[in-house]
Amino acid sequence: MTLAKEIARDLLKIKAVYLKPEEPFTWASGIKSPIYTDNRVTLAYPETRTLIEDGFVEKIQAEFPDVEVIAGTATAGIPHGAIIADKMNLPFAYIRSKPKDHGAGNQIEGRVAPGQKMVVIEDLISTGGSVLDAIAAAKREGADVIGAAAIFTYELPKAEKNFNEAGVKLVTLSNYTELITLAEAEGYVSPEGLALLEKFKHDQENWQA
């Protein structure tokens, strides 16, 4: 079994992912979605956590061999990033969503030298906006961001467009296609539910029509 499939199976099993194509969730953006993901839950399950962190290390070593520092997005990317940095014996930093309004006013916490090659860790990619904002902040402070890595992506066309426009390489451990295919095969959703889930991937506005 591939890593992407193993992680998809674990996310379903521990209920980090909920699929409700017939009774959709409403995301903060207002989008009606048949899927809801809370990857923070993975931290409570040592086997899943180890699978994820080892997967990150393997992907980063393969895709970004020159990495010199790992950074996590606040807050979801912090625990994963810290574990990855420890496993890889690399420095760790984290990137706030905005600079502190007191003290030194830092947006990056930790020590990042100018030109240091950074990989930014996020737990979930929907449109990619938050991690790309974090990457822009890291670049402003002198980091050489060579890529981003996340546990899971919804594979939304908007995310692909955003990463391409920003010139940022993204790698993920698992993805929406792997997960919904496995979910139907293992009885989490019906064939009709799978059809709705597939429609959502291609058209987030009109998938229920």
Swiss-Prot record:
Pathway(s) it belongs to: Pyrimidine metabolism; UMP biosynthesis via de novo pathway; UMP from orotate: step 1/2
Binding site residues for orotate: 126
Annotated InterPro entries: OPRT, Or_phspho_trans_dom, PRibTrfase_dom, PRTase-like
MF terms (GO), sorted A to Z: magnesium ion binding; orotate phosphoribosyltransferase activity
Cofactors, names only: Mg(2+)
Keywords: Glycosyltransferase, Magnesium, Pyrimidine biosynthesis, Transferase
UniProt-listed HAMAP family: PyrE
Name of the featured protein: Orotate phosphoribosyltransferase
Organism for this UniProt entry: Streptococcus sanguinis (strain SK36)
